[in-house]
Design a protein with these regions (language model features):
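Alpha/propeptide regions of enzymes that mature by internal proteolysis
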Residues: 1-381
Length: 381
């Protein structure tokens, strides 16, 4: 693996993205959201199941941070192509909410991560689980990192998940080879974890939309940056094209906002993630797991227990659908930028199955040169 001296982001290269980002240009610009990572990188050479090499991890998202009592997190879910997993979505589709952390990892570690999150919730919300009949249905999503990681060795342990959850904080985030995105691949370059945000105004009220992606999708020929067909200018070192000739990856998109939205509205927001990733070129592959979740931190109400007195109902504030165009624009813009942030921050990584290839991090100078050919780069001040 080749390290870079500094973690640049796509905007640092002069790419002229639309929209206004928040302070951190991250999902943590949404007040209350906390993110934690566990990153596992160990070993070199061809895969030996159970021994390594290990290049994987866990990303933990706490939509309302660490609280003594959970509350419903209103949400909507959408699959563009469902060759993947996101647990907890049956209930989200049914009831419109969840109350767990969200974790993202590799495909073969979903069970361990789910197990660990249940334990964390029982400890974190002790009174709820000890004094009432609460049940935990964590949201755990995945993408496949078996080309760079001994995925069948299942190296993510309970302690790694707990570390990511307990380490979750607000503020700026790491990107690229970090957390669940450690071993991921995007457009046959090294990919990983990326984030971005947008600030919008609706009837003079300010709102924030933030996204986090675990980016592991795309074939080189489709790779597009702000409308520029970059992949057509960059055919070399495209490992999947050489080995399989088709896309085999996935992407998880998590959208968080403080906009007051109903679950059915959040599902509509989640659907727009397809347009955001589509702007980077992908048509959505047959073998891809493109799974999206949108949640809001608004309309914070108490989670009723089975043994407590039930409220007659809740009073929710929500945005008029006629104001949604600006929301959709912001979501699409932030997702496009988050994917590119993952790629720009990533570091090159060798493969383990098959061994002997290198997944190159995208070369910043070459990307800038291609963008300049199309007059799609900001002039340096």
């Amino acid at each position: 693996m080749t390290a870079r001296p500094a973690k640049l982001r796509a905007r640092d290269l002069g790419l002229p993205f639309d929209g206004k980002p928040g302070k951190f240009n991250a999902i943590t610009d949404v007040s209350g959201v906390e993110i934690g990572f566990t990153t596992l990188i160990e070993g070199e050479g061809p895969v030996q199941v159970g021994k390594g090499p290990i290049r994987t991890g866990v990303t933990a998202i706490l939509p309302r941070g660490k609280r003594e009592k959970p509350s419903p997190i209103w949400a909507g879910h959408h699959n563009l192509n469902g060759n993947g997993e996101m647990t907890g979505t049956h209930w989200i589709n049914e009831a419109g909410y969840f109350f767990s952390p969200i974790c993202i990892t590799n495909t073969h570690s979903v069970g361990m991560v789910h197990h660990a999150v249940v334990g964390w919730m029982i400890d974190q919300y002790r009174s709820l689980f000890q004094e009432d009949h609460a049940w935990a249905m964590p949201v755990v999503a995945e993408t496949y990192d078996g080309m760079t990681n001994d995925i069948c060795g299942r190296h993510v342990a309970e302690a790694h998940v707990l570390n990511a959850l307990n380490a979750a904080r607000p503020g700026p985030l790491q990107e690229g080879n970090v957390g669940g995105g450690t071993g991921m691949i995007t457009y046959e370059f090294k990919g990983g974890t990326g984030t971005s945000s947008r600030m919008i105004n609706i009837t003079d009220k300010a709102y924030t939309i933030g996204v986090l992606v675990q980016s592991n999708f795309g074939t080189r020929k489709d790779f597009t940056v702000l409308g520029v067909p970059v992949g057509k200018h960059w055919p070399e070192d495209a490992v999947f094209t050489e080995l399989t000739g088709h896309e085999t990856g996935s992407i998880i998109v998590i959208i968080g906002t403080d906009l007051p939205l109903l679950p059915i509205q959040l599902r509509r927001v989640a659907k727009r993630a397809a347009i955001g990733i589509g702007r980077t070129g992908t048509p959505g592959g047959h073998s891809s797991g493109d799974i999206f979740l949108a949640f809001t931190t608004a309309n914070d109400v108490e989670l009723p227990g089975l043994m407590s007195e039930q409220p007659l109902g809740y009073s929710h504030h929500y945005i008029n659908d006629n104001h949604f165009d600006v929301i959709y624009d912001a979501v699409v813009q932030a997702i496009e930028e988050a994917v590119l942030n993952a790629m720009v921050a990533a570091e090159s990584m060798t493969t383990v199955k098959p061994a002997g290839y290198t997944l190159e991090a995208i070369d910043h100078d070459r990307l800038k040169a291609i963008m300049m050919q199309y007059n799609r780069l900001k002039e340096e001040p």
